[in-house]
Amino acid sequence: MTRERSPFLLSYQKQVQTTWLSLRLYENTDLLIDGEKQGLGLQPIFCQLSSHKNVNTHVIVTGQGRGLSKAGLKNFINEKNSSCEVSIYDLDIKTNNKIGVLELVFQATSHFLNQIQPDVLLYIKDSENYAIRGIDSALLAASSLGVTGISVPIEDAEHLIWLAHLPIEALKHWNTPKVQVQVITQDRPDSLARLVRSLKSSHFFGDEISLTINMDRGADPVTKEYCRTLEWPFGQKNIRHRIVQGGLMAAVVESYYPKDDHDYTVLLEDDVELSPYFYTWTKYGILKYRYGPDRVHSSRMYGISYYGSKINELYPPGRRPFDPAIFLEGTNFPFRTPYLWQVPCSWGAVYFPEVWREFHDYFPARLQDLSGLNLQNITVPETRSNRWKKSWKKFLIELIYLRGYVMLYPNYENFMSFSTNHAEAGTHIHLVEGKPRPNDIFGVPLMEEDVVLSGLPGGRLPNFTDLPTLDLIGNVVPREELIQRGRSLQSEVSLCPPSESDELTFDPKDILCVNEERRQIAMDEIEARKELSKKLHTAVKFIANHTLDSNDEMEVDPERLLNIVLEIYNSSSISPSIVDLPTSTQTSAVEIKILHDDELVTEPQVTQTMELSHVTPKVQK
């Protein structure tokens, strides 16, 4: 069988000889379009891409026989009155044979990739389309050229215009970040189902998204069955069930540990609901600030919030209404610009791997110190979170303050957000009769229509250095001031001096340095307390194991029996010769708290309930 060859290959070879020098002086983006529907979907994107400076945009169509020719695409562009400086090439495929189409597209795409070596090739994702299979095969064969293939489902194309606002440097990393979703749940199956429905309605642009549902030990049967039967078409589904109740703090922190620096996680509690455009905000922000030129400035950015907060919970007296527009008054920043805030969001956010890995080292070290030696008093100045007892955010806020880290927040009109919290009863939410429902306080409207770009100043995400920075209270401050505040606190709580370098190690060891002499003193005190506890344990058991003679008519002062216990406790050694309590068939009601050997006490802890009438202890002379 004779292979068909596209006339494009012969004519294009002559064109390349005259344009080769100009092609290599500029970055190149290519789009391959198979048919009119794809052309309609991708036209706004390639026209916007063509406006990039020093970027050549090439569009390849498969021909009139496949639904769209070069002339047809030109007419369509003219009808749209688009300013669109693109080079259009027509493969003019005439065959209807599926394998023939695949081979012709493979040949043409391979030739194009080898000759132009574009930075990016954008096309529609469709595994049933043999022309698209030809593109996939050509990209695979030319993998050594380093061309980034970006394939998106046709239904997502109309929501992809933000891609054209990214620099080519960022687009080349389209497939680099891997985003996983971690859901925390226990016994709210209806809430969980609502969250999953919102996830399924989102635009993921062809990315593979793994979903992990983390159930605590107390998960009810309905929740377990829902998780078992749940279908997740966007990637791998994982179900985890704890055998020991861990609580919300452990459930959140232990749900995710990054496998590399491109492994991102979306943390969601089950009473959160998402906008269909939450992943647009996620991927746009990650590519913009992590993989483009902005990355040299954004190393202290630890995540992206989906929730546009209208409450600041960190004021020392208590929660206060919060509107970033008010804090931006009198500055040069637009009222509705996204902003960088130190406060971590637990109501829908994506967290970055380096800082979360650092937090995984910092958090257990702090817990261990607080439950043992208590050598570090890390108190964030004028912040309510210092009083929190069961929140993982308390410790993350400490780390954030010490490092000067920030999170990106949306700031759309009327607090429109990519997530909302329904604030249903749970670990930190309690419904109180006669008071406003928590959802009325914390709930925000979801972005239901695609206004991701139109709601931003200038219609795009600002450069990192153009974003305002807010401290924990919400005041607009220079980023350098946040860093200096953290260094100042570190100087107070750690023996290791803070680094003056802007290069981050994401290792908390320098924060956790303590005086070794003080550590040894504290350890000796702990051992002494353990020894005292053992002595008291022995003394109390010695007394409690003797029955008391109640035949005598003399009454015993309850304090005297307690003094016997304390005499034994305070002695340097425990000896039966100190007291001699005879046995009796009658036992009085004596209740004394006996400490376990591993319990620590700072002073004798004896609880007594005594009914000692007609009891005579016999003490040796």
Predicted regions span which residues?
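Peripheral/terminal regions associated with large enzymatic or DNA-binding modules
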Residues: 2-267, 272-598, 602-621
